[in-house]
Amino acid sequence: MYPSTLPAEADPSTMNGSSVAEPPDFQAATAAAAAAARASSLEQDEWSVGECGFLDPDVQRTMRSGSAAEDITQYPMHGWVDVTKEFHDACAELQPGELAQDMLFGLFEAMSAIEIMDPKMDVGMGFDKQDLPPPSFEAAIATGAIKLDDLTPSELIGIYDALFSCLVSWLEGNSMDQVLFTCLYLHAPAQIKDKALRVFCTAVRNLIVVIKKIIAVAAVNEEEDFQLYGNSALLAAEKAQPATVYSSLKDVEDELIRKCKKLTSTEDWMAVVHRLRFMRHLFQVIYHVEQMASNDTVDDKVDIYKILLVASEMLPGIRNTLDRGTQPEKGSDAPNPMGFSPRIHDRSQPPAFPRSIKIRDRPSSYQFLEEMISRFKYACKVTKYKDYYSALNFFIEYSKKSGQCILSRSVLQTLFSANMRMAHGKLPMKQFLRHSVQVFNSPPVLNAKHPVAADPKVQQHLENFFRYCINMNTFTQFIRICGFNRARQRDKLARLIENFDTIQVDAARLDSMMNQLANERAMEGNEPMATALKHSTHFSTWVLYNCFRAMLIFLMSGFELELYAVHEFLYIYWYPYEFLIGFLVSALTRTENILLAQEEYAEHQSKTQSGGSGAAKNRKAAKPKKNKKTQRPYRAEIVFYHALLSLCGGMYKAMGALTKDGRVRLPLSKFDNEEIRYNRRFLPFATLTSPPPVSYAEFKNVREHMMRHSVEDLYTYAAKHFDQARNVLESIQNPDQEMLDLLQIARTNFVVMNVLARGHQKEVKRQPEFDFSKHSYFPIIKLK
């Protein structure tokens, strides 16, 4: 049934002079009503009822007769028409999977229509007309559905476990009202007489407030991660006092322990104590993290790590006593038989929450909490990383391990920098970046002991550069982006890469000024200062390295998110093989060479100074150090990038061979424009001056040159690349799990390419399977 809108014949005197603002696209009937409202000399019969042909004929006759005029109390008036037959006839013209689209029926309306009356999406489908309204807290007390005092250990354990399950379901992105506040005890904990239950429910309410604050301050959540807002009135009923929760939980624990000493069988009560103790430690950790946003000390982080160790040790014992609590009833949505009303807030939810919620089961909820605590412990290690290079590496690695847990990602952001202007809570970000450049490639101008550091002109240029870096927020935003979920990271990296161009220009300008100052000091006869400033590319190298990393993460994340079609793999692997990884290796190699040159210059200066002093002649000559280790801090990373370079080369040549061999399904030419797809994939790189954008014509020329080789040669070339990657990875000492996975991929693909080069399955042109289960960026090629 569709409503039809009719402009009622209203008195012109009441409508004259009224202002009606209309959007550019609106219904014809509404347009007629708006025109009637704006016209000052409009006759009543100018808009005839007959023009509104979609109205039911009976309604039209009634309107013409004027008998309904006295009954009109609302403007406009709706006449309902049964369009079921017409609707079914129109739908018969659509093929399965097709959607109708109209100016008034777009994708939003289509998705709403699909979800309506689907039991998995439409929460209203779970109701029957005979269902009684879900009981409120007061109604449940009146009917005796819940107990407020003298709860047994089994009942307490069941409620505790159910609340932990609801907490985990909330952290997974579900509505707070539909999971946590289905527990009636959370609505008014002050009315609960049982102290163990009252204190636990109060702790949960305060935990909700603290978690919401941490996530809001960290600001790395999106709508699919976490529902930050809920029914605030439920939380406002009792004022949150997080500072008193810890002592209250400890008092209840002590009382129950004293009670256990008087009992013969204590297993059930000790299971209650363990859950209270775990809640106390969990709350203490999260509350400390929230407080560190304003008062950050290293001691707090050490305390947090110790508390996390205790909490993680308690979880195995709790999981072993899950069967001691009351269990959910079969066929019921409630996580516990007593104290929960799953549908209490369904009718009060806004349209944004139409779906039915399935609360996690208890074993998997405690598994989630155990993994979350492990991530918290890992996040505490961020305090060891005092420069941007190592901190960024840690954030990238943590992003891969944190998964979809928004609280874990928010805790890391808070531990590192709750304020974007401060690193580790107390170090100004400008000073942090300055120290990071010094650690990365040690520019002499940043060395306080070097004479060039006293030059006011040099310091002014440095101050302007780092102030510009802070104002642009590019480097701080790069770290913050690593806190978002993996899908959102790619979208935000695309915008971040565009910002690097202006900083690259500023860094190049700074290096140029340093070289200019070097020439001026040389003309003045100040050779030491001129040598320190000459050929300075420190700042450009640092900026370019971080830009290249952002580009590589952006490009390769498309494989993890399954955004690329198989026929696109060719140019996706080609770009890092031909350009990006080579740029990264070049930047790191140049940095190492700078460090080596500075080391040699320092040794030369030391020998010159010691050789000229008389005291040095009387001392015994120092023995030369054997096998002196030179500064090569980036050697391991360079070797790893060489392995990635060979893997990208192998995949690029393999995709070329498979395409030429007819084993890759290509889109139909009339539906395909490869140039458009290519430009869209590399669109964020188009604004950069370094590296310069690579046009589709350049890629096409390179591909045509490669495709001149025979299929067998291309398979052989791909096998050689995979073999090179295997050799590089096998040479790495103490490889981590990622390197071992890449080694297995290189070995397997090497064998597959050799098999295809010898003509295996030459007559069967099936597209191979690309298995990304081992690694997100590089697949194992499997022949079918």
Curated annotation (Swiss-Prot):
The keyword Cytoplasm applies. Pfam families: Mak10. GO terms for cellular component: cytoplasm; NatC complex. Residues 617-630 have a biased composition (Basic residues). It is found in: Cytoplasm. Keywords: Cytoplasm. GO terms for biological process: negative regulation of apoptotic process. InterPro entries: Naa35/Mak10. Residues 1-23, 320-353, 606-630 are annotated as: Disordered. Auxillary component of the N-terminal acetyltransferase C (NatC) complex which catalyzes acetylation of N-terminal methionine residues. PANTHER family: GLUCOSE REPRESSIBLE PROTEIN MAK10, N-ALPHA-ACETYLTRANSFERASE 35, NATC AUXILIARY SUBUNIT. Component of the N-terminal acetyltransferase C (NatC) complex, which is composed of Naa35, Sbat/Naa38 and Naa30A. Belongs to the MAK10 family. This is N-alpha-acetyltransferase 35, NatC auxiliary subunit homolog. It comes from Drosophila melanogaster (Fruit fly). The lineage of its organism: Eukaryota, Metazoa, Ecdysozoa, Arthropoda, Hexapoda.
